[in-house]
Amino acid sequence: MEQSHQNLQSQFFIEHILQILPHRYPMLLVDRIIELQANKKIVAYKNITFNEDVFNGHFPNKPIFPGVLIVEGMAQTGGFLAFTSLWGFDPEIAKTKIVYFMTIDKVKFRIPVTPGDRLEYHLEVLKHKGMIWQVGGTAQVDGKVVAEAELKAMIAERD
């Protein structure tokens, strides 16, 4: 049953995120949700550290966080927004759902992300119909846009 959860808490820590998103190391790319307005917008972040496995090869002696992982982090953040907008903070329902990418559009990478950066994801709902969600927004470091994208996803039953 689809419903709206307008009275959600606005901040979620890693222990909450792990109860909603199915992603785990090394693919969980959201450390904290710092703002959430159901059916409207979300702000989250990931702390980028030199200890990320990806820096072993991207690139030795010049570590740059891959743009595709920035987009994945935006997608995970959007998935959290979509799920909690429909079902609130409900770990039991979360065990039965999964969010799948449908499209990735208007992607632009502007500034490299490097160790020590706090990568913030700022997303807003562009469209929503049933289990289909379209979100758009930016990834930012220190208030500067490092990437932008529009993402469409669907929430499905997890097998």
UniProtKB/Swiss-Prot annotation:
Q: List this protein's GO terms for biological process.
A: fatty acid biosynthetic process; lipid A biosynthetic process
* Active site positions, chain numbering: 58
Which cell locations does it reside in?
Cytoplasm
Q: What is its EC number?
A: 4.2.1.59
* Gene Ontology molecular function: (3R)-hydroxyacyl-[acyl-carrier-protein] dehydratase activity
User: What keywords are assigned to this protein?
Assistant: Cytoplasm, Lipid A biosynthesis, Lipid biosynthesis, Lipid metabolism, Lyase
Q: What InterPro entries does the database record attribute to this sequence?
A: FabA_FabZ (IPR013114), FabZ (IPR010084), HotDog_dom_sf (IPR029069)
- Pfam families named in the record: FabA
| Catalytic reaction equation(s) | a (3R)-hydroxyacyl-[ACP] = a (2E)-enoyl-[ACP] + H2O
Using the UniProt record, name the top-level EC class of this enzyme in a single word: lyase
Which cellular component appears as one GO term in the record? Answer: cytoplasm
Keyword presence, Zinc: no
Superkingdom, taxonomy of origin: Bacteria
What does it do? Involved in unsaturated fatty acids biosynthesis. Catalyzes the dehydration of short chain beta-hydroxyacyl-ACPs and long chain saturated and unsaturated beta-hydroxyacyl-ACPs.
**Entry's family note:** Belongs to the thioester dehydratase family. FabZ subfamily.
- Put simply, this protein is called 3-hydroxyacyl-[acyl-carrier-protein] dehydratase FabZ
Record organism: Helicobacter pylori (strain ATCC 700392 / 26695) (Campylobacter pylori)
Organism classification: Bacteria, Pseudomonadati, Campylobacterota, Epsilonproteobacteria, Campylobacterales
